[in-house]
Amino acid sequence: MGDIMRPIPFEELLTRIFDEYQQQRSIFGIPEQQFYSPVKGKTVSVFGETCATPVGPAAGPHTQLAQNIVTSWLTGGRFIELKTVQILDRLELEKPCIDAEDECFNTEWSTEFTLLKAWDEYLKAWFALHLLEAMFQPSDSGKSFIFNMSVGYNLEGIKQPPMQQFIDNMMDASDHPKFAQYRDTLNKLLQDDAFLARHGLQEKRESLQALPARIPTSMVHGVTLSTMHGCPPHEIEAICRYMLEEKGLNTFVKLNPTLLGYARVREILDVCGFGYIGLKEESFDHDLKLTQALEMLERLMALAKEKSLGFGVKLTNTLGTINNKGALPGEEMYMSGRALFPLSINVAAVLSRAFDGKLPISYSGGASQLTIRDIFDTGIRPITMATDLLKPGGYLRLSACMRELEGSDAWGLDHVDVERLNRLAADALTMEYTQKHWKPEERIEVAEDLPLTDCYVAPCVTACAIKQDIPEYIRLLGEHRYADALELIYQRNALPAITGHICDHQCQYNCTRLDYDSALNIRELKKVALEKGWDEYKQRWHKPAGSGSRHPVAVIGAGPAGLAAGYFLARAGHPVTLFEREANAGGVVKNIIPQFRIPAELIQHDIDFVAAHGVKFEYGCSPDLTVEQLKNQDFHYVLIATGTDKNSGVKLAGDNQNVLKSLPFLREYNKGTALKLGKHVVVVGAGNTAMDCARAALRVPGVEKATVVYRRSLQEMPAWREEYEEALHDGVEFRFLNNPERFDADGTLTLRVMSLGEPDEKGRRRPVETNETVTLHVDSLITAIGEQQDTEALNAMGVPLDKNGWPDVDHNGETRLTDVFMIGDVQRGPSSIVAAVGTARRATDAILSRENIRSHQNDKYWNNVNPAEIYQRKGDISITLVNSDDRDAFVAQEAARCLECNYVCSKCVDVCPNRANVSIAVPGFQNRFQTLHLDAYCNECGNCAQFCPWNGKPYKDKITVFSLAQDFDNSSNPGFLVEDCRVRVRLNNQSWVLNIDSEGQFNNVPPELNDMCRIISHVHQHHHYLLGRVEV
């Protein structure tokens, strides 16, 4: 039911593992080719125990269930830090409890199971890992992994009988009936020759059949002590002494990042850009102090030496913070991940200096593929992770981390290299990975509800105004098929030269790689396609023949939207004439946007190719041209693309006349007109046009300073971030929360200081006047606000307008006048070039559909995709990136980084620690794979909802496989429960009971259940292991 996890019985766990492996060559969703095989001869020792890799899952969501531990092992985890247990083992936790959007926050800390159930999960995993090692990585040197027990939170609780039973059974389970039961179950399975033959294990028959008797009864020799934030020093020391003296366990004690002190922690977070993370100074007052820790650790190290045991520290615990995000319940939340790294590694440096590198350190605090090599090379080991495994790629990030470590020369290091650690601690304060800006704030999203089926989507495509086939053309570039890539681009994009330079690349703000490292440089790849593919593409290109039966089309305006419309329609055989009042085509791109942003020859390239399709251009046309006149000239369709070429300006008191409007200024600048602006120019506004004006003004002779004045803050600024950064690079200065009021003849510009109030209808906080003013000495002022369409001209043309003065159009841009369309900025105001092309595309698609013409044919590029190859990229982070100057290396890199999400998404599968979401291939759907949710495995942590690009929650909205009737009854999820020959099905809060035969076939399926029943049948026939028993 909902957040109640149902453990898998041991025998059923083995069935699940082997049946999935036989059916899919995967185990818990990890493909066989991505099972990690440790490098022979490289091991690490932790207090006398040997493990084949120094990495593993931290005590947390990845070590709570048996299947989580199995999955960790499959992907390279060999130091398994089991989830913390405590005497209070029946707490009810509010959900969701994880927010891993960037730095991670959580509101849970110990296992959600009772002590008995937790121990049982660890025992199942203990047996399963021994079996998997014998199957896939047999060795004469014994097991390659270490189980490390994690207990908390006070000595009184630890001494209670249930905790004592748990600890004792972890140390020696020989007398526990469960151990004998699981050994007998495993022995029975391995004595079955049919089972061994079915899985190709006959050659290992002898060693496998001897395995059950060899499995040790002691699961742990070490413990990691976890204490609550604010635990008194004497209590921490008492628990450590108890573990060393009474239990004889090698001990790590987990310490808090608060050891650095409030001022230092606050300083580090602020310097790294995480100033919004709220801290309570009094929390630091209650925590262990550094001087107390040093004294305590010295005593405990001496005690451990006396007892011939190991003792060290686990660095670090999470950081307690104020819950100010509103994403999780409660007043406090606990931070981990990359924001914790500079804190934890500096704690490690402080302690290592104090103990001259002789204090063993188990590490977990922002470890990832980007930091793990540096951590390991200091001599710190083991290294465990939780936050990084909650991101897309999931457990596969463990394998990627291990590949980073394989080439290290620090495997034999038996102490901490203090000098090296000091350097790393200093670097951690400035390295890109630890700075907040490393991960953009944009959330990858598809602004539609999560569908029940066929949910694989490339967010880059959905974010694109023209729905460019981005994954496909990137794959073609990676195969050096440049002309094919360009052909595919041209299917939807009439202006690749222009959009390769000045596209707002919404695709990059919605690239799945943002959850790994950085977005693909998609816009630059488009440039490469044109550069490398143009010659071959042009050679095989043929001018459209045209057709006498196609209706003539008139397009008013030869800017980006008009050019795109002409291209799409001429390509389909329509005779097209573009009517332009200027002496050239290109509109704002040609005449307004400064040429330092895009070379004129590239603009002309796109114009010339449109003309090559047979589009006619008539320049110098009368601005009084009307729809009626064009209709009278036998143009069946009329498209109006006149743009927004009017500035509203700004009303100022004062008598200074040196005020220019942005569009006339930029037009004169592009013409090369000698402009006299003086030394200091102020630009009012903060859109892209304002950025162009400020950058252009700085290039005018005599101008020494350009300042942008904006009445809101940087966060509300409408300019693209890229345009803002380029303006900064050019030397443009910015004054936010300032609004001009008066401009006097002596050059005094009076600015009203503003503050931010409540959000407006667009979500931007409204500027509110204060009583404060400031003045600047200014020579010229340029207003870059309020670009709008010329409503008088539109009225004169005969275009119907709505009550707000905008053209009255439908989704395709068609007006209330049949066959008359509005496209580009004139439709709804200033937008991007690619958005203008998008409006042209929608309008021309509507026309071509009316004419019974298919608008594009690119199916030939949608095949030949290997899901296994795509899946291979899922765990990898790009440590270093080549820039685009080396074109061949750049293309190879970006093609290898593309995750082709519309073919293999399964982010919800990746990020689920419990393996509660699965993807299976089901015939008969648009997507090759369908995603199912397994109710029994889910605790509703919310992590899959965080990373799903759709508006929805996979754990609530996907087809759910139920294992128990009570859980089906207590849920509202769409899904099904198989009960022998009956299947209970629920969809849209309506329920059915259907009959299913032994072959998985239904009779008399209601039409609305066709898709769901097709999936149920497929699961019944080919993935029956998903229907196995669970424990109540």
Swiss-Prot record:
Binds 1 [4Fe-4S] cluster. Keywords: 4Fe-4S, Iron, Iron-sulfur, Metal-binding. It comes from the Bacteria. Its cofactor is [4Fe-4S] cluster. PROSITE patterns: 4FE4S_FER_1, 4FE4S_FER_2. InterPro entries: 4Fe4S_Fe-S-bd (IPR017896), 4Fe4S_Fe_S_CS (IPR017900), DPD_II (IPR028261), FAD/NAD-bd_sf (IPR036188), FAD/NAD-binding_dom (IPR023753), Helical_ferredxn (IPR009051), Se_rdtase_YgfK (IPR017701). Pfam families: Fer4_20, Pyr_redox_2. GO terms for molecular function: 4 iron, 4 sulfur cluster binding; metal ion binding; oxidoreductase activity. Residues 928-958 form the 4Fe-4S ferredoxin-type domain. [4Fe-4S] cluster binds at C938, C941, C944, C948. Could be an iron-sulfur flavoprotein with NADPH:O(2) oxidoreductase activity. This is Putative oxidoreductase YgfK. It comes from Escherichia coli O157:H7. The lineage of its organism: Bacteria, Pseudomonadati, Pseudomonadota, Gammaproteobacteria, Enterobacterales.
